[in-house]
């Protein structure tokens, strides 16, 4: 991991959130998602202060009791950090998270808008939410980061994701020499996807990001798109001979390093008794072939179109009726946002329609499980013959990296060309266009009928790649990129050099 550094992590969600248990005893629940796992591993090797939003009433109690200061926290991986909760004004946070971040920025960056009707920035109150929610919440994060920097002036400030595009500029204005790093965990689309948002927003986003010393993306594709949009939106200049741009007198190096997983942590989860119990049920009820998808109920995951593809597959191959099912383990996501709630209803309707058309005694084509159950998902990882990942766009997609390491059937990965993971794993998977239903149906059949030796070779290649390019590789690489940028500048092939450009569009 190199030398021990002081790092101030800044993210919307923190590593834990607190609830009251029996007799109102405070109980910590680990924060969800791969981001928490990735950032939490930093605390194992570095001196970490973590700034995050208070997500529960108990979190807010802790923030008040601590006077807004950081408190010592033991993370799930056994490492220690200082955790500072920010208790935001509820109305401002609602506008920040439920109007601007989701759906506006999420939909723009995943190219999800129905452009005939959306976005309607006036009726949605987007500009009001930007000014009264997103901007002040970012200012609160920046103020907290500056306070922590005053105690640890040599620390790296590590901003994360699309919730915090404005904070770096606010920190830079008052701490010109600070070391600032930001990683964008979702896709960075082409310029036309940004043009659907008001100019005030797109200019501020690009200006904020360019206050960092290094901005990281999962892929060269997303990085290339950022270079193009930064040049167009704020007039940034490409630095000759480097993978960097300059803006108002400051150079920002641009890194392309795909986040990854901790294979040891996944192996421990695979052996969990709760996973084995779910796996026992799957083995007892599964047909000859099992197609598995594991996703959040997010429109970007393309679940409804995936069910249409499975329906077409069944139309084309009646000989496989009763012999194949699709297990869909879906984690409910952002159901307080109308677009997400509507999408869950669409998922349920589509699964019901396909099942009513094809099911017969003892066979249900689509086994739809909508619940937050990581143990069921990992059991699905172990048992798939084909893993189906057809996201419209996805910054990376960690399922594509996790599942092959857990799988016990030499399963085949079917992977959307618009996922960040495709830049790494494309040679070892069946590539699909996420908008082409026939291509997806054909890929399911090809996966289930692939020669055994090819299946073994492909999944072995994925495992080797992921184990070599694991979470430690990602973290070490980002810190190296920052140190290199601050010391020597950034050469074209020095940042994320092991990843190759696959696409220049999207």
Model-identified regions with their sequence ranges:
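Catalytic cores of carbohydrate-active enzymes across secretory and cytosolic contexts
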Residues: 1-506
């Amino acid at each position: 991991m190199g030398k021990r550094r002081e790092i101030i992590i800044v993210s919307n969600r923190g590593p834990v959130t607190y609830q009251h248990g029996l007799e109102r005893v405070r109980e910590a629940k680990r924060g969800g998602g791969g981001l928490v796992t990735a950032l939490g591993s930093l605390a194992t090797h570095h001196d970490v202060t973590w700034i995050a939003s208070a997500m529960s009433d108990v979190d807010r109690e802790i923030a008040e009791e601590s006077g807004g200061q950081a408190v010592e926290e033991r993370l799930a991986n056994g490492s220690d950090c200082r955790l500072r909760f920010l208790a935001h004004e509820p109305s401002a946070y609602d506008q920040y998270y439920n109007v601007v971040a989701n759906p506006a920025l999420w939909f723009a960056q995943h190219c999800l808008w129905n452009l005939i009707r959306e976005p309607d920035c006036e009726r949605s109150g987007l500009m009001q939410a930007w000014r009264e929610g997103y901007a002040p919440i970012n200012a609160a994060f920046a103020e907290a980061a500056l306070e922590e920097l005053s105690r640890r002036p040599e620390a790296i400030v590590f901003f994360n994701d699309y919730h915090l595009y404005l904070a770096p500029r606010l920190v830079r204005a008052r701490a010109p020499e600070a070391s600032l790093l930001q990683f964008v965990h979702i896709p960075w689309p082409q310029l036309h996807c940004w043009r659907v948002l008001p100019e005030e927003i797109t200019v501020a986003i690009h200006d904020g990001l360019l206050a960092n010393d290094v901005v990281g993306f999962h892929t060269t594709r997303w990085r290339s798109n950022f270079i193009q949009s930064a040049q167009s939106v704020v007039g940034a200049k490409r630095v000759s001979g480097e993978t960097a741009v300059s803006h108002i007198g400051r150079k920002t190096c641009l890194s392309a390093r795909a986040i990854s997983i901790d294979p040891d942590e996944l192996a421990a989860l695979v052996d969990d008794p709760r996973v084995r119990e779910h796996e026992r049920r799957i083995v007892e009820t599964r047909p000859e072939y099992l197609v598995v998808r594991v996703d959040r109920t997010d429109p970007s995951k393309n679940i409804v179109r995936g069910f249409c593809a499975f329906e077409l597959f069944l139309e084309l191959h009646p000989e496989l009726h009763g012999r194949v099912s699709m297990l869909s383990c879906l984690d409910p996501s952002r159901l307080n946002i109308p677009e997400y709630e509507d999408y869950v209803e669409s998922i349920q309707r589509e699964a019901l329609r396909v099942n009513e058309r094809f099911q017969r005694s003892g066979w249900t084509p689509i086994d739809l499980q909508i619940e937050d159950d990581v143990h069921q998902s990992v059991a699905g990882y172990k048992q798939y013959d084909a893993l189906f990942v057809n996201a419209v766009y996805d910054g990376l997609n960690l399922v594509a990296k996790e599942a092959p390491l857990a799988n016990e059937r030499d399963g085949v990965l079917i992977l959307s060309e618009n996922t960040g993971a495709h830049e790494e794993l494309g040679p070892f998977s069946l590539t699909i266009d996420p908008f082409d239903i026939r291509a997806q149906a054909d890929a399911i059949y090809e996966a289930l009928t692939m020669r055994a030796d090819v299946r073994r070779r492909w999944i072995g290649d994925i495992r080797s790649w992921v184990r070599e390019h694991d979470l430690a590789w990602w973290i070490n690489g980002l810190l190296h990129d920052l140190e290199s940028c601050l010391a020597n500048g950034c050469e074209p092939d020095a940042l994320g050099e092991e990843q190759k450009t696959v696409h220049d569009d999207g």
